[in-house]
Amino acid sequence: MKPNLKQWKQLMLFGIFAWGLLFLVIFIYFTDSNSAEPVPSSFSYIETKRLLPLQGKQRVIMGAIHDPSFSEAIDGNEVLLNEDLLDTFKSETGSIKKWTDLEDAFRSEDEFFPSQIGRKSKSAFYQVNDDYLFAAGQPMSHNSFQEIAKFISADEDNPKESILQNNWSRQRRMRRRSTKHRRSQMLDESDDWDGLYSTMSKSFLYKLWKGDVSSKMLNPRLQKAMKDYLSTNKHGVRFKGKRNSKLTGDQLFCELKERVDVKTIDGKEAPFSTLGWEKHVPQIPLGKLYTHGFGSCAVVMSAGAILNSSLGDEIDSHDAVLRFNSAPTRGYEKDVGNKTTMRIINSQILTNPNHHFVDSSLYKDVILVAWDPAPYSANLNWYKKPDYNLFTPYVQHRKKNPNQPFYILHPKFIWQLWDIIQENTKEKIQPNPPSSGFIGILIMMSMCNEVHVYEYIPSVRQTDLCHYHELYYDAACTLGAYHPLLYEKLLVQRMNKGLQDDLYRKGKVILPGFKSVKCPERNNFPPL
């Protein structure tokens, strides 16, 4: 019995070994065969983003949420409309009207795709497919552009129109089904992140060009940001005026001319008077620095959309050029030029060592105009508790550079602009100061005969890239979260005297200076 038992045990061990060997062979076979197949990236886009280097510089966005935990790299600028398509706009009679026929093809169920929530990839929502217009943040394929160009320029009775529209409708329905699932999935993943980012739809951009947008068309998170700022009311805004939007562009211009007073801290009001500030501030007010003013002026926004614009020579041809914050010219001359006459800087520039305010050439040999958010009451006790303490570096700079014109804007001027924006907007706007861009436009309108503003209202190169010199993507930089940017841009669009083609191609708005236009008597305006 014992030999048989021993043989039985040996047989069992041999069987177990054989099964193990067979399992190992099968496992190796399948793993080898899978490795021969194309394998998707071993990291999701979100996981890969965590491996990207973080942005080194602090972003100079007054009041913006600062969260450098994500970064995004996109090859080139995210262009919304191809030049071939734009050429068709220009050449065809009634082409703008035909563009409205395409709006539905560009529109998803929302005016704003929340496809950058948490600065996550657009490809998280939309598959990369050449047949999809601007899918996943990629440029449209050449064939797709040719089809659209043919569609726009075709005759009204061309049967290809209905075929193409039907094809787009079918693709759109398929995309919506997959998008809803992807969108809900991404929203679930990003519930713990409170950023406010979205990507502009093509129909929204077109409506912005026409001045026909509202906050209801924004991404839900941007809408939530606006509601949060309204409820927080950090600056104690108590608006007592009336809201309407009935003024024409010319009437709005005259309203601004009548009421805007570019006021700076002159050292004569308390507490500055008791601190001896009269000896620190320039003796000549900003408005009288150039007695005859300027002829033509350029206001150059720092928006990423100005990349690849080749506007540098045109910008430098102006008599004066205004730039903002830490926006450089070196290395970007082809797109932004190199002339700088004035630079508007917010208080973060003076206080954050990363901006090298003390020793950078950006802030030398130019007029400097600084500002800091103050209470709506414009109480100058704000000196004791500014958002960022710009006063100490200001005095230090004035002592070292007494001949350089350097001003601090009076809170009364800043909130005066806010009042005018709110009075001319039906909706309640964010109770926060206007953007540096809007402030700069109004300052130059008071000093120049004509003002050319570049990429304030975005061109066809519109992108979520905040600044042309920083790798940071945020749709709030274009439409506003903290600042009432959307409403500012609608006012500027209303006053635009430039060509529509310049707006589409260059992102250029032309505004008359206050001294160049004679306005009628104030009682001719409708009551505010």
UniProtKB/Swiss-Prot annotation:
Residue spans, topological domain Lumenal: 32-528
Keyword Iron-sulfur: no
Gene3D superfamilies: Glycosyl transferase family 29 (3.90.1480.20)
Main location as per UniProt: Golgi
Localisation per UniProt entry: Golgi apparatus, Golgi stack membrane
Described function: Transfers sialic acid from the donor of substrate CMP-sialic acid to galactose containing acceptor substrates.
Protein name: Beta-galactoside alpha-2,6-sialyltransferase 2
Organism encoding this protein: Gallus gallus
Native organism taxonomy: Eukaryota, Metazoa, Chordata, Craniata, Vertebrata
